């Protein structure tokens, strides 16, 4: 085969890549569209004549994959975390103060990389030796869906990096979105064909990325803006600032947002926020705020992460959009713990890209605060552009036939008494698991991903099983068989087998998951894990008295009482024993041994300003020493750790004769024990 054909093919590919880079990344087209199309057709014809020379990174190969049966799962090597939100100047000030507290640098001296917060879908794109190899959705942050074939169809994403010296592995993280003009054109075409339209550009982008047929995705006007780097393997070091890393990505052909800038000091951050907010309607794509990131990578590393978000970044969201509508009715829903929640039934209204017909009224106090009545004209807001809320009533529009909202005194589901404990805002049904609504929600919680993770059993299946009275308690799930499931509506052979396999798989769990799945009020994931780590076995937890329970990290008086009372209820014990009898099992946790030290098993209070540790670090250190950390000084307090400017707690401790330790003494204890 003539060598000139290979050379000609590569020349055409490089030229087309260059044109794509200038068009999609630099927004500076080098040639008319007709010339681009001519070269693309020339390349297609040559590759058709010489199929053995087609490469996976050729511009012609954006759409070539066959339709998929479903999306495979991909585990992110580095979790794709979400961001904490700020909704006001006070929230921004709090964010900056937390940074100052952690790294002891005045926030007005810290440079931030400021970006618009695009309203799209977060994705991860992996390049291996410069070639696009894999792409995934964010998913739950740990696991996403394989959307490689669809990502390859997006025109402003290079299939091959624009460099002769690519990193061995480079993971680009960014937001896929649909520009407003493309969204409008897509809906116009759908209307012309009599097809369903999309509510907003974000939904359109999500639906396009999750098409099983990449050819459909290729017809959708999607774009990417990169915002970070994940996995990176190369002999070359990355730039030392976030901004410079984004500019480096741009040189590789990866598109980044044109509005990104640097700012130092709270006034400059607020000015950027206001500038982007003013430009919001003219940008041509949807945004819902700004993202502010500490620019220096070394400072990012010092600040670190909390469980679900980095400490060095925040999403400063725009005020939610508001609209007026009519309150037609109020329904009262019963939750898993018996909480009675009033739900407003609204005349449908379009707010922030979504049609809203329901909104929570939270509780009876909120109804009184708003002074709301059925028939009122209300102001609806999507808080954070996500959760619909009623924020006010237009009193002058109240009709003569407006009807006062009566909070129920009996459960709307089981007719049990509704009570409100003094000091709590929520009224609750007293029916417990006698109440069908509580039982249903408890079962939904039991099978949920963070509990027993029975992914073949969804909410609709739970509802159908309960309606037919085939299950009453969690243990009944493990008694289901193939014949029973096949009698259900819309239950096929495959679905029945998947459900039974998921149920069987769920029998092997962990003590923490099992505790969380039981749905004990106020026992969340973290508390369940702390209980498992502290006690090691279920029997030890069941036998613990109130004082023993309160020794567990983050378990106070209220949670200890909830736990203790749970095990005093014979029905709860029966449910747990039935689950174990059905084969639910886990490995006992070996409790961590804490070396003997003067602070072990003591109650300690922190006060004042610490200079070497943050408050969270000091608390964690005390817990490693086996202390119970309390928030207030009492006669039961053994030690007070006093930092600078200690106030009333120090005075009270001295009055009660509590031993006072300095921050240095605390660190000294810890250093002695671990060394």
UniProtKB/Swiss-Prot annotation:
InterPro entries: BRCT_dom (IPR001357), BRCT_dom_sf (IPR036420), DisA/LigA_HHH (IPR041663), DNA_ligase (IPR001679), DNA_ligase_AS (IPR018239), DNA_ligase_CS (IPR033136), DNAligase_adenylation (IPR013839), DNAligase_N (IPR013840). Its cofactor is Mg(2+); Mn(2+). It is an enzyme of class 6 (ligase). PROSITE patterns: BRCT, DNA_LIGASE_N1, DNA_LIGASE_N2. The active site is at residue 117. Zn(2+) binds at residues 411, 414, 429, 435. Pfam families: BRCT, DNA_ligase_aden, DNA_ligase_OB, DNA_ligase_ZBD, HHH_2, HHH_5, Nlig-Ia. The keyword Kinase does not apply. The keyword tRNA-binding does not apply. It catalyses: NAD(+) + (deoxyribonucleotide)n-3'-hydroxyl + 5'-phospho-(deoxyribonucleotide)m = (deoxyribonucleotide)n+m + AMP + beta-nicotinamide D-nucleotide. GO terms for cellular component: cytosol. CDD domains: BRCT_DNA_ligase_like (cd17748), LIGANc (cd00114). Residues 594-675 form the BRCT domain. GO terms for biological process: DNA repair; DNA replication. One of its GO terms (molecular function) is DNA ligase (NAD+) activity. Keywords: DNA damage, DNA repair, DNA replication, Ligase, Magnesium, Manganese, Metal-binding, NAD, Zinc. NAD(+) binds at residues 33-37, 82-83, 115, 138, 175, 293, 317. SUPFAM superfamilies: BRCT domain, DNA ligase/mRNA capping enzyme, catalytic domain, Nucleic acid-binding proteins, RuvA domain 2-like. Its EC number is 6.5.1.2. Belongs to the NAD-dependent DNA ligase family. LigA subfamily. DNA ligase that catalyzes the formation of phosphodiester linkages between 5'-phosphoryl and 3'-hydroxyl groups in double-stranded DNA using NAD as a coenzyme and as the energy source for the reaction. It is essential for DNA replication and repair of damaged DNA. This is DNA ligase. It comes from Glaesserella parasuis serovar 5 (strain SH0165). The gene is ligA.
């Amino acid at each position: 085969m003539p060598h000139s054909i290979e050379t000609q093919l590569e020349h055409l590919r490089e030229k087309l890549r260059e044109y794509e880079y200038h068009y999609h990344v630099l927004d500076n087209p080098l040639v008319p569209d007709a010339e681009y199309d001519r070269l693309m057709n020339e390349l297609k014809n040559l590759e058709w004549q010489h199929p053995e020379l087609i490469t996976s990174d050729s511009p012609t190969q954006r759409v070539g994959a066959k339709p998929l049966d479903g999306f495979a799962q991909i585990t992110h090597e580095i979790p794709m975390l979400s961001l904490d939100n700020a909704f006001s100047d006070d929230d921004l000030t709090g964010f900056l103060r937390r940074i100052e507290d952690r790294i002891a640098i005045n926030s007005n001296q810290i440079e931030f990389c400021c970006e618009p917060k695009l309203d799209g879908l977060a994705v991860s794109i992996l390049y291996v030796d410069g070639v696009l190899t894999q792409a995934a959705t964010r998913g739950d942050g740990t696991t996403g869906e394989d959307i490689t074939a669809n990502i390859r169809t997006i025109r402003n994403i290079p299939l091959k990096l624009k460099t002769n010296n690519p990193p061995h592995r480079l993971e680009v993280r960014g937001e896929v979105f649909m520009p407003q003009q493309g969204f409008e054109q897509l809906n116009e075409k759908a209307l012309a064909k009599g097809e369903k339209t999309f509510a907003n550009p974000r939904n359109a982008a999500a639906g396009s990325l999750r098409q099983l047929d990449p050819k459909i995705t290729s017809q959708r006007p999607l774009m990417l803006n990169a915002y970070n780097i994940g996995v990176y393997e190369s002999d070359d070091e990355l730039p030392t600032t976030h901004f410079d890393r984004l500019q480096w990505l741009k040189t590789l052909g990866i598109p980044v947002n044109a509005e990104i800038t640097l700012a130092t000091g709270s006034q400059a951050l607020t000015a950027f926020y206001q500038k982007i907010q003013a430009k919001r309607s003219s940008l041509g794509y949807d945004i819902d705020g700004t993202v502010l990131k500490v620019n220096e990578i070394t400072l990012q590393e010092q600040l670190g992460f909390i469980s679900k978000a980095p400490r060095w970044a925040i999403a400063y969201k725009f005020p939610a959009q508001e609209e007026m509508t009519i309150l037609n009715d109020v329904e009262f829903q019963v939750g898993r713990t018996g909480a009675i929640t009033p739900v407003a039934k609204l005349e449908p209204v379009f707010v922030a890209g979504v049609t809203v017909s329901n909104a929570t009224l939270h509780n009876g106090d909120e109804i009184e605060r708003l002074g709301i009545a059925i028939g009122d004209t209300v102001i609806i807001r999507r808080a954070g552009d996500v959760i619909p809320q009623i924020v006010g009533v237009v009193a002058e529009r109240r009709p003569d036939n407006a009807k006062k909202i009566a909070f129920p005194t009996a459960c709307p589901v089981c007719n049990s008494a509704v009570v409100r404990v003094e000091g709590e805002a929520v009224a609750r049904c007293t029916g417990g698991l006698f109440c069908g609504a509580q039982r249903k929600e408890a079962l939904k919680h039991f099978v949920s991903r963070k509990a027993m993770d029975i992914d073949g059993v969804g909410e609709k299946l739970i509802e159908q099983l309960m309606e037919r009275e085939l299950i009453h308690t969690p243990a009944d799930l493990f008694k289901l068989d193939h014949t029973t499931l096949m009698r259900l509506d819309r239950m096929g052979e495959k679905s029945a087998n998947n459900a039974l396999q998921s149920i069987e798989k769920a029998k092997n769990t962990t003590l923490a998951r099992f505790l969380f799945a039981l749905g004990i009020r106020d026992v969340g994931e973290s508390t369940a894990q702390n209980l498992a780590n502290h006690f090691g076995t279920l029997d030890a937890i069941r036998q613990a008295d109130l004082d023993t329970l309160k020794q567990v990290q983050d378990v106070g008086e209220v949670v200890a009482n909830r736990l203790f009372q749970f095990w005093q209820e014979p029905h709860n014990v029966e449910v747990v024993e039935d689950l174990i009898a059905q084969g639910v099992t886990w490995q006992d946790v070996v409790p961590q041994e804490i070396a003997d030290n003067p602070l072990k098993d003591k109650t300690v209070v922190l006060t004042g300003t610490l200079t070497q540790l943050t408050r969270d670090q000091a608390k964690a250190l005390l817990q490693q020493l086996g202390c119970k950390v309390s928030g207030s000084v009492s006669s039961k307090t053994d030690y007070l750790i006093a930092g600078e400017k200690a106030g009333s707690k120090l005075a009270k401790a001295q009055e009660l004769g509590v031993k006072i330790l300095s921050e240095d003494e605390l660190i000294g204890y810890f250093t002695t024990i671990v060394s």
